[in-house]
Amino acid sequence: MSEIKTDDPKRGIKLRGADKTARIPIKVVPLQEKLKKPEWIRAKLPSRKFFEIKDILREQKMHTVCEEASCPNIGECFSKGTATFMIMGDICTRRCPFCDVGHGRPNMLDPDEPRNLAESVKAMNLRYVVITSVDRDDLRDGGAQHFADCIKAIRETSPNTKIEILVPDFRGRLDIALKILAETPPDVMNHNLETHPSLYRKARPGANYQHSLDLLKRYKEMMPHIPTKSGIMVGLGETDEDVREIMRDMRAHNIEMITIGQYLQPSDGHLPVLRYVTPEQFKIFEKEAYELGFSNAAIGAMVRSSYHADEQAAEALRESHGGCGHH
């Protein structure tokens, strides 16, 4: 897998917060007065298992997105013995202003990473693992082969572990990426739409809503038995009707599983929270998602893309192998 550039003096320098978002098309404007966090936004405190897992991760030099993206559920998920691993480094080639992962020119791929990841999964005794990555626009296949190598390595050392991949959009490299990931499939294929298309210039510069929908639709056509999944955040300026429109678009593109959670601002350099959706409204979205035909919907303030992914997948995999009637 060859890189486009080799000796780059800026490679490996990570920008965060306001430094990262300084050059995006629509500037991040802080609110005069921040919205007060409501009482339902609460994370659970970590247990001893959480600290054991952190030790294993440091030993194996692995990054979890749980840590890098400052996820509020980190204590709960680590305590259950589940984790989402971020491969291909912790420097992203995009500058999305909702995300707490650093931006810059990434380092070369680590050829030992698939083996290290597989060893971590085995050491942590995971039943279910989610693998995600930064965007790697510097790679000719967007990093798809590295995903495949990680899947293969885990299958060899932990054959009973279910694998979900949460992929970037492989912009400009979609054909080759889908081919690679069809040859070495995960158990669940996840790619997040993140928000309504009207907010893409503000929240997801460099990405395209229709392209992301097409990625999942095309993968489903190639691999009908692999459940597809996508997620969005609320609180960036969308309306309830916008959320419903996204759900309808997902179903029109054969996406079976959905996650919807509250956006929380990682720092003052990130997009402000424009609304806190109430637990009652999340319940309404959940009901509407099932009415639209999603096989599983994880919808609530503290839900993130990988939150309770093991439970979601168990249901979706039962349905897809048992011939559910959605397609």
From Swiss-Prot:
Any Pfam family matching the protein: LIAS_N
SUPFAM superfamilies per record: Radical SAM enzymes
InterPro entries the record matches: Aldolase_TIM (IPR013785), Elp3/MiaA/NifB-like_rSAM (IPR006638), LIAS_N (IPR031691), Lipoyl_synth (IPR003698), rSAM (IPR007197)
Listed cofactors: [4Fe-4S] cluster
SMART domains: Elp3
Cofactor info, note text: Binds 2 [4Fe-4S] clusters per subunit. One cluster is coordinated with 3 cysteines and an exchangeable S-adenosyl-L-methionine.
Binding site for [4Fe-4S] cluster 2: 92, 96, 99
Domain Radical SAM core span(s) in chain numbering: 78-295
Name of the top EC class for this enzyme: transferase
Pathway the protein acts in: Protein modification; protein lipoylation via endogenous pathway; protein N(6)-(lipoyl)lysine from octanoyl-[acyl-carrier-protein]: step 2/2
Binding, [4Fe-4S] cluster 1: 66, 71, 77, 306
CDD domains: Radical_SAM
HAMAP family: Lipoyl_synth
Similarity section: Belongs to the radical SAM superfamily. Lipoyl synthase family.
Protein known as: Lipoyl synthase
Organism in which the protein naturally occurs: Neisseria meningitidis serogroup B (strain ATCC BAA-335 / MC58)
Annotated gene: lipA
